[in-house]
Amino acid sequence: MVVLENPEAGPEEAAAAARVVPGGRRTLPLPGCLPALASSQVKRLSASRRKQHFINQAVRNSDLVPKAKGRKSLQRLENTQYLLTLLETDGATPGPEDGDLAPPAAPGIFAEACSNETYVEIWNDFMNRSGEEQERVLRYLEDEGKSKARRRGPTRGEDRRREDPAYTPRECFQRISRRLRAVLKRSRIPMETLETWEERLLRFFSVSPQAVYTAMLDNSFERLLLHAICQYMDLISASADLEGKRQMKVSNRHLDFLPPGLLLSAYLEQRS
């Protein structure tokens, strides 16, 4: 049975969790994922040769054969290939000790990791684990990255939508489907109804941009107007039958809600 480490443990607890194995070497557990294994001996070599050493070790541990046999073997192969892409995208060039007389490029992230003893121990610990444990570590790291992105909130690109030319009143109107645009141009639109729905959506999504707005609408023309408003505001709308009635659901595709500077009702009045 695998016992997970506490991902929120402080530096003192992490140091206490580290074990000393015969030979005086410490083993560091992978934080929040897996228990520690006895670390393997690593020669003190240059960063570039250490990289080659880890690559060779990864190939040996991946059980490479002409045709991988079994699910575990395939899983270990996929995990190893994923990790080796870190080296392929690193961009570091060989140094003078490898026969290159040109000045060495600045070390990349992978090269720096190879020269850090703590990272070396974690790398060896990872490569000595089974395919299932490696997959578990990768899933943990991926989930951690997603949770950090959610905690950071909306990106700057979304905050610049007010100045983005794609969000001018004219471009917002072009987002409306051709059929709905034709109806808005040819029909006599009840502006009071249009303004009422605009006010409801503005009030709702300004307070809860990630919530879902629902409304029961039996009037087909009113549903059409609501769809047009949603497309103009870059919202997502859908209607479905619910107990013999039509229910509208509206949601926001962005993390925050930034309505156009000119609402649809005002834009239509300008065009008339």
Swiss-Prot record:
Q: Where is the R3H domain?
A: 191-254
Q: Name one GO molecular function term.
A: nucleic acid binding
Region spans: Disordered: 141-167
Q: Which CDD domains match?
A: R3H
Predominant location of this chain?
Answer: nucleus
| SUPFAM superfamilies according to UniProt | R3H domain
UniProt entry keywords in alphabetical sequence: Nucleus
Superkingdom of origin organism: Eukaryota
Which residue stretches does the UniProt record annotate as biased composition, category Basic and acidic residues? 155-165
- Designated name of the protein: R3H domain-containing protein 4
Q: Name one Pfam family in it.
A: R3H-assoc
Q: Which gene encodes it?
A: R3HDM4
Q: Which organism is it from?
A: Bos taurus (Bovine)
The organism's taxonomic lineage, starting at the top: Eukaryota, Metazoa, Chordata, Craniata, Vertebrata
The protein's location, in the record's own words, is: Nucleus
One Gene Ontology cellular component? nucleus
